[in-house]
Amino acid sequence: MTEQIKVEMIQDGNFLAKEFFSQQWQLYQKVLKNNYMGHREIYHVLHELLVKHWQKPFTMLELGCGDASFTTQALLNTQIAEYTGIDVSVPALENANKNSVVNGCQGNFITGDCWQLTKELAQDEQQKFDVVFTSFALHHLQVEEKEDVIKNVQNLLKPGGFFILIDVVRQENEDRDSYVQRYLGNVKKDWSLITPEEYKMMDNHISSSDFPETQSKLKNISQKVGFRDFECVYRDDLDTTQLLCFYR
């Protein structure tokens, strides 16, 4: 194979990757705009939780922050003093930086794999936060990886701090295949503006990349790694999404 052909193949691959990311991003924005995953309700609960628990200035680390648009809204009129966001996407972090300005707090943005960086930050005694937060991301990991992340998060928290997890969660007696079919059934029934092509993208993504745990499994992990308490603060009407708090 000539070097020219190799270069052309790499360029074609990069173009296809960017095109695929663009399609996924557009679909995600449609999901957010139409509130198909209930972001408005759950981030309202997040806002109320932060107002209730933090009447003094607090710091937050968000893992996989994306453009932080919903987090920014949840932080309005709270005592947030410093926000740190980690994401693999440079364009998303640039938007997150712009979005976070409205909160008037110090903003720090780190490019990289949030799970790997969580491990590295946990080894630094100077890196401690009042709140660590992640939304619709942890379920992409296998159970052993989830446990490692939650253990590292526990080490990142100041005494009295807590880890807030927004994510999809399986019902207690539901296996993964049943969860996938139930979730996709809800998508087909309720996500009325999704095209057949977009539904196929959702099907491919969920079937290949979603590995949600049950609430009891997450509670067991929280106890195993040393959290003192665990609470389900919110559960959506479809029983697919929860907001969980792990208290240090």
Language model segments and positions:
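Conserved S-adenosyl-L-methionine
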Residues: 64
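A short glycine-rich, Lys/Arg-flanked "PGG" loop and its adjoining helix->strand segment in the class I
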Residues: 147-159
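Class I SAM-dependent methyltransferase SAM/SAH-binding core
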Residues: 61, 69-71, 75-117
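Conserved alpha-helix/loop element of class I SAM-dependent methyltransferases that forms part
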Residues: 38-56
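C-terminal alpha-helical "lid/dimerization" subdomain adjacent to the S-adenosyl-L-methionine
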Residues: 166-223
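A conserved beta-strand element that flanks and buttresses the S-adenosyl-L-methionine
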Residues: 133
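Core SAM-dependent methyltransferase catalytic element
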Residues: 226-248
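N-terminal, positively charged/glycine-rich alpha-helical extensions of SAM-dependent methyltransferases
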Residues: 1-27
